């Protein structure tokens, strides 16, 4: 058994139903919330209210209605824990097609590989190779409701096969289904004193669906999927035909119960908190008011992302962003930088880089992310 197994066990520990004193909210398939494209990554891991791009399927499919192109495809690759291993990664492929000026459809496949694990129970045995992985397949339909506003609905299938069968015969692959509801507003070009501008806003309630069960044991624990609410807005300053600067802000909240049930030791002392075992719909509504410390802790469950994107001639881009999460809820804090290029043939290439500013090490720290897109006119 090699050292990679220890890394995999560390990653899979996120499925543990118990949370320690920080009361971090845990879910199954957390990779669903990881930014898979370099543009959004360069803007502080956000995209619900940015301008439309080929990866809008993940952030807000309603944006496709405002695309100037008829269809497009995109690919991305993100190494994970690249400082420790070289075969854990997140990959994504997305496609969209505008049926008309009022409607569009889109789809994507996201695949998260935890790499190959060689397991030896006896040094003389032939290694048994395990390949835990997770993937999702989704499709969306978007409809323009007015000149400036569109909404979309998405359906998603989730599969999580993270069992190590040779070590644990009581676990199995888990699956679920989910839906998303999103909306996007983009104003007309408005003239101001010395510049033009476009106002944008968006929301996305994603991964609304049943919990996942990994245990074969009857009555075994089920894990919530990461139902999530994104709210964002932004403004693009257009200084002339070649130069523009877009500012965007996004707020996120997980719509799953907080760890609020006390776990006691033999002396009756509180040693941890765990999530209540309730239905996923009840959990969504309960998530707005179940934190043990009341409204103050509910506010701490919000994450914030701020991004800047400078565009020259709509062909060269420089990006920067900041992401912040409260220490009690995970303490993810990082700065992101990125760049992008777009050719006359609508080929786009984007790169981003993450720099952690927290004591908590990010698995994506010092990782270069790459994404490619191509539009068809």
Sequence positions of predicted segments:
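Subset of outer-membrane beta-barrel
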Residues: 20-377
């Amino acid at each position: 058994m090699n050292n990679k197994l220890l890394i995999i066990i560390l990653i899979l520990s996120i499925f543990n139903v118990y949370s320690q004193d920080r009361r971090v909210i845990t879910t199954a398939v957390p990779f669903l919330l990881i930014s898979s494209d370099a543009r959004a990554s360069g803007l502080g891991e956000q995209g619900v209210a940015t301008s439309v791009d080929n990866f809008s399927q993940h952030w807000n499919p309603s944006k496709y209605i405002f695309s100037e192109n008829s269809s497009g495809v995109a690919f991305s690759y993100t190494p994970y824990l690249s400082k420790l291993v070289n075969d854990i990664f997140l990959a994504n492929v997305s496609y969209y097609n505008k049926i008309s000026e009022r409607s569009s459809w889109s789809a994507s496949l996201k695949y998260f590989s935890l790499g190959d694990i060689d397991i030896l129970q006896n040094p003389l045995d032939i290694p048994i190779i395990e390949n835990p992985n997770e993937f999702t397949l989704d499709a969306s339909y978007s409809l323009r409701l007015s000149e400036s506003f569109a909404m979309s609905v998405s359906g998603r299938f989730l599969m999580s096969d993270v069992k190590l069968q040779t070590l644990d015969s009581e676990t199995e692959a888990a699956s679920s289904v989910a839906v998303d509801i999103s909306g996007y507003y983009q104003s007309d070009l408005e003239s101001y004193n010395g510049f033009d501008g476009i106002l944008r806003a968006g929301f996305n309630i994603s991964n609304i669906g049943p919990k996942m069960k990994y245990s074969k044991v009857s009555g075994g624990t089920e894990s919530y999927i990461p139902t999530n609410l994104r709210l964002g807005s932004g403004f693009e300053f257009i200084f002339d035909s070649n130069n523009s600067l877009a500012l965007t802000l996004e707020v996120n909240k997980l719509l799953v119960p907080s760890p609020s049930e006390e776990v006691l030791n033999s002396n009756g002392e509180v040693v941890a908190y765990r999530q209540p075992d309730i239905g996923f719909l009840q959990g969504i509504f309960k998530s707005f008011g179940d934190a043990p410390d009341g409204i103050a802790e509910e506010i701490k469950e919000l994450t914030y992302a701020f991004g800047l994107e400078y565009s020259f001639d709509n062909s060269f881009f420089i990006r920067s962003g900041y992401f912040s999460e409260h220490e009690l809820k995970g303490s993810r804090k990082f700065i992101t930088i990125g760049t992008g290029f777009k050719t006359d043939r609508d080929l786009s290439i984007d790169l981003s880089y993450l720099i952690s500013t927290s004591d908590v090490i990010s698995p994506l720290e010092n990782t270069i992310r790459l994404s490619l897109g191509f539009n068809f006119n």
